[in-house]
Amino acid sequence: MVHPVQVGKRTRMSFSRLKEVGQMPNLIEVQLDSYDWFLKEGLQEVFDDINPIQDYTGNLNLEFVGYKLDLDSIKYSVEECKERDSTYAAPLKVKVRLLNKETGEIKEQEVFMGDFPLMTEQGTFIINGAERVIVSQLVRSPGVYYDMTVDKTGSKLFSATVIPNRGAWLEYETDSNNIIYVRIDKTRKLPITILARALGYGTDAEIIEFFGEDERLKATIEKDNTKTREEALLEIYKRLRPGEPPTVDSAESLIESLFFDAKRYDLSRVGRYKFNKKLAIHLRITNQIADQDIVNPQTGEILVQKGEKIDKDKAIEIQNCGINEVYIKIDDKSFKVIGNHFVDIHSLVPFDISDLNIKEYVFYPVLKEILDNYADEESIKEEIRKNIYRLIPKHIIREDIYATINYELGLSYDIGYKDDIDHLGNRRLRSVGELLQNQFRIGLSRMERVVKERMTIQDQEVITPQALINIRPVAASIKEFFGSSQLSQFMDQTNPLSELTHKRRLSALGPGGLSRERAGFEVRDVHHSHYGRMCPIETPEGPNIGLINSLATFAKVNEYGFIETPYRRIDPKNKRATNDIVYMTADEEDLYVIARSDEPIDENGYFIDDKVTVRAKEEVLVVPVSEVEYMDISPRQLVSVATAMIPFLENDDASRALMGSNMQRQAVPLLKPQAPIVGTGIEYKAATDSGVLPKAKNAGTVVYVSADEIRVRRDSDGGIDKYKLLKFKRSNQGTCINQRPIVSKGEVVAKETLLADGPSTDLGEIALGKNILMGFITWEGYNYEDAMLISEQLVKEDVFTSIHIEEYEAEARDTKLGPEEITRDIPNVGEEALKDIDERGIIRIGAEVRSGDILVGKVTPKGETELTAEERLLRAIFGEKAREVRDTSLRVPHGEAGIIVDVKIFTRENGDELPPGVNKLVRCYIAQKRKISVGDKMAGRHGNKGVISRVLPEEDMPFLPDGRPLQICLNPLGVPSRMNIGQVLEVHLGLAASKLGWHIATPVFDGAIESDIVDCLRKAGYSEDGKTVLYDGRTGEPFDNRVTVGYMYILKLAHLVDDKIHARSTGPYSLVTQQPLGGKAQFGGQRFGEMEVWALEAYGAAHTLQEILTVKSDDVVGRVKTYEAIVKGENIPEPGVPESFKVLIKELQALCLDVKVLNDDNQEIKLKESVDEDADELEVNIEGTENQPEEKEEKEEEKEDSDEYDDLREEDVEPDLEELSLDDLDLDDFGDEH
């Protein structure tokens, strides 16, 4: 029944029936833990891989001994980095030792290896002042994968791929003649026996003896024209290195370096783990019949007798006593199963070796050698440590290759199984740490080359580590990764939920991943292994659907990069659900039968029903209680955070829920956030983990609270913790970040207590929208096609008002003609335009500005013209005339307006770091209050989105019997066909809850049901169907039928009409085609495309069509004449030849075709080569519009790019219309696309 739950400072009435076992993990630990691992272990691994660097003679030996990140010498804090456009990083210092073997001299030095970007507490990086997130990548795990296809004759053909982390691939395939081929590193295919011979089984007899009798093997041997190991080696060498003279030695070393050299071939820990898992012998012999006695080689004891069935435990015992070949009986044939000879070290070493921390299987022959040669515990441990890379090889070994071939042979006897590439057991996550590690490794290996070269060139006596090491390649590869990798993304900061989701995103794209074009349907589809690991709902619509996913709420990532989800263990003896929680990967989960979390159990954990609904792999079954092994821990463990915030998700169609999840991330933070009346109970957790809210670092008492600072006296030592609050800061997306304290003076706070609310949070709960009184009713056609009718009250009372902050910057540079100057003294500008400019030439804070107003006054020196003799004489007499300057001030762009909230000034004199050539940098921040208006996009949480069609006066809105007018009217037809019934339930429950004064939590898949809602309505005194009589506000008459009315949570999305509305008369033109540019950012025109031309043709509107194709587009002279005619009020002249026609003729001429243009009388029409010839007759210039909108370059993506823009701006700022005649202008250079 409904019960109160405390969420932060608010009490919610919860409808959940299930007791949740286990806590949700910290929602951004994916980022934090991974980066942490990188700093602690990942960096060390890379240095270990590269150690030692030797010169070509092997005399000099350079090794990296240790490293530290110098956290004390971080230059700027996170806030300062954002302000100064710098990177939040710490210097990486590495201790390097150089050994000269001839002289035995050792030199040690600490070498600075560049600044290393640090992760902030929120899981982000500050790169060049912009906050970025590194998205985790889902890739195919290294390992062995088997696949099966059926050919025309119906026979099964098996293929395999051996994928390392880096190195050469091996691919096996069978053709319809039963011949097995291998491709080495994507080259042409060879019979597989050639590979077996090259690896050591040279003759036909040896191959058959080792792999056992098999038709496919025999067929392959017949096809194979080599007969000895040497021939096979030469054959492989010819294929891999065509055109080089083959010798046996070079072939041997080629194969060695391709597969058995740890520097070239890396399986990684995951790869080794997956290999041992797949190729272990015990999996293939379990439940098979032994064809010979199986004897323990150490003791001589018979483990399994001939003809006996091998059970699971016996199979594991067989493997762990070092047996690698087992004969089993299949359809009266004997088949030999070969493993890769890895064993569990703990079963063979007679004492405790937990301190060695070996989790993987180890290679048996090496272990046996150690155990045979050493007896006492210490020396065995010492030898194991020494030989760890032989015990757990990082590269593939011969035994692995033999086992893969044997597995391939066994598949046709139904021994082993084929793999599903889309299963999450075969896909792993590369998070920040690993991506960085790979990048760092690339940088170090480039550096290694340089070091080797310097070792040979420089004098070996005086050489120092510092002189050998060039850190450029390392620094460059890190910089490149953070700056331009596909996985390093500009953080989506629209609201706290979008930040959180961005950090939890999983992408299958990026380097080493898939590409949009190649990704088929299977990769994108929902898979049974996604359950509890990846959300089946939240993914973008469009070309990336299914390639970009979101981590589920309870999911964690294990040390190998596989995603795990938690389950409750069911006690095997008495079948009772315990509170033990086990995290399982997808392939572990496949071995068990798992019950649903809402399966009824009593208070002691016993199942109430005899039959239980369970999941087993991809099937949903009903089984007796005795078979259940695990149980889900929560109904919301299968969805992501955004999806878990949709109440009544279970009543929505999946495609609408997808839109709901995605649109919550686009909700703009409002002026006064309001938590939802009907929530799901996860809002608090999401807000606290998103990192936007300040928390108390220590327990204590609040001693001071103001709008921008909170001070807490610590209980431990009486010291004071200060917390600065952010006020009206600009987010990456231009929304407003503003924090408001929620504690009061004297309040006692525990550690981790929230001290303030941020954007879109209310008492620590995420609050993306507003609770609005709405009804499902049509109104005069204003709800047609998802339009929304809203009341003027929402505008008057600022219900949906949001603050948006834009940043504009001006820089004063050195130009060829002298430095630019920021000044109040601007040519041809009246005092009126300078009323808010201070004496430095910069706008004052608090000024109200409109489009075209000056923000920063700036003048640029103009080119000096050649002076005539008279002028020179006058100058000589009257002294130097003031140098010519032109006005290049920063102005408010077209269509923007607001209030200046902040101005930042950076100059060389104050010691600020500025880009080369820049003397002064000014940034102005303009804030706008945007009220809700017609054309804004709004949405509920159930994918019910719409655009505002009309703002109606309050008195005309339909009203309730108690006189309250509705705030929004929605179209009832938006519900049935879209099947998002959740919105109706939300409205009913919202109506009851607002009357009862409750806030409600109805968790997904475990929330209120119909009867609960009816009870609440009854309790609140409403009728059970939730409908009420509604009166027409214009006439006061009741509407014919009763109407569903209630409270719905509605969001205002970041698609605001002010950002989209756009109009142009004249403006910039493209350089080559001379057609208007496109898009609002370029102040472009509307495209009149092919189909639109057909429409005019269909109506025979010849003049309109001619006008559109010429003077409104690219007839350069014609458009100037037309403008002139309009200004003078004359008739519009005949259009000329469009520029694009001239471009076409030039293209044809480039193809060596001589093209002439003829008129009706077959007279050639001369096309003028340049516009200048036409230009003489013109008097008006429309090229420079009055104030040419400077491209408002989004500061968004990369700040480095801004240099390119600025170079262009100086030369291309358009002059004023009145000042110049067209002759002064070189028309070709006009308004080029920046």
UniProtKB/Swiss-Prot annotation:
Keywords: DNA-directed RNA polymerase, Nucleotidyltransferase, Transcription, Transferase. One of its GO terms (biological process) is DNA-templated transcription. This is DNA-directed RNA polymerase subunit beta. The keyword Transferase applies. It is an enzyme of class 2 (transferase). Residues 1169-1234 are annotated as: Disordered. Belongs to the RNA polymerase beta chain family. GO terms for molecular function: DNA binding; DNA-directed RNA polymerase activity; ribonucleoside binding. Gene3D superfamilies: 2.40.50.100, 2.40.50.150, 3.90.1100.10, DNA-directed RNA polymerase, beta subunit, external 1 domain (2.30.150.10), DNA-directed RNA polymerase, subunit 2, domain 6 (2.40.270.10), RNA polymerase alpha subunit dimerisation domain (3.90.1800.10), RNA polymerase Rpb2, domain 2 (3.90.1110.10). The keyword GTP-binding does not apply. DNA-dependent RNA polymerase catalyzes the transcription of DNA into RNA using the four ribonucleoside triphosphates as substrates. Its EC number is 2.7.7.6. The gene is rpoB. It comes from the Bacteria. Pfam families: RNA_pol_Rpb2_1, RNA_pol_Rpb2_2, RNA_pol_Rpb2_3, RNA_pol_Rpb2_45, RNA_pol_Rpb2_6, RNA_pol_Rpb2_7. Disulfide bonds: none annotated. Residues 1171-1180, 1191-1234 have a biased composition (Acidic residues). Transmembrane segments: none annotated.
